[in-house]
Amino acid sequence: MGGRGGRSHGGGSRTAPQSSRYDAVERLARQMGIYLNVGSLQRGNINPIYVNETLNSIQYIYTHFPIMTGRVQYIDAETGSSRAYASAGGDGGLHMGLYGRLSERDLQRQWEWDVRSGFHPQGTKPSGIFIHEMGHQIEAYLNARDYGNAWSWGKTSSEIVLRAARKIDPTITGLRDPKVYALASDISCYAVSKGSHGQYPWQVWETLAEAVQDFSSNDMNAKPLSIAIWEELKRRARR
């Protein structure tokens, strides 16, 4: 759930990484209690730098959300979608997609295009892709803690997005108020993704995840709703 979208179809070959680089990220993952299902990394198809950046993103969230420490169980680079940068589920797993397969040059070029077009938040970089996915992991944890089902996508995020929006504009009547959509779309186009979302006007879990990456990259220069979501998410996590 929560695939991080990418819209270019460019590819790129890699040179085989040195075994020492692989050993370093493997040691770091082991220290963090994370299983690496990245066999292709050893075959030169996955850049160890990407794995290291993923681990750094996880540690960033652990630092700011201590309740998440140890929640990520594995990183998988073998079964991730080739149509999204990455994805996350409610089972403590993170999956590499395009993020693990594109060359560094092609990944940077694609990401810059996504940012210029407004598809992803301004000021963000490819290295923060898994910050977005950790936003989904936080929601999964809160869903499980508060409602008994990690996979109830939208349950927690809809509440957080609405509370955050009302901090900005107390006159907002509900999640379907056009003013909420306007605030969310100011973060990015992906923050108001349409799709399978049941009772929600859009995929509000993507609003939350995009806000997490926006704030982690831009701090108090992030969009107003991103700042409010980050603050509300931290408040909720401290319950």
Please report, for each region that a protein language model flagged, where it lies by residue.
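Non-Sec secretion/translocation targeting segments of pathogen effectors
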Residues: 1-13, 209
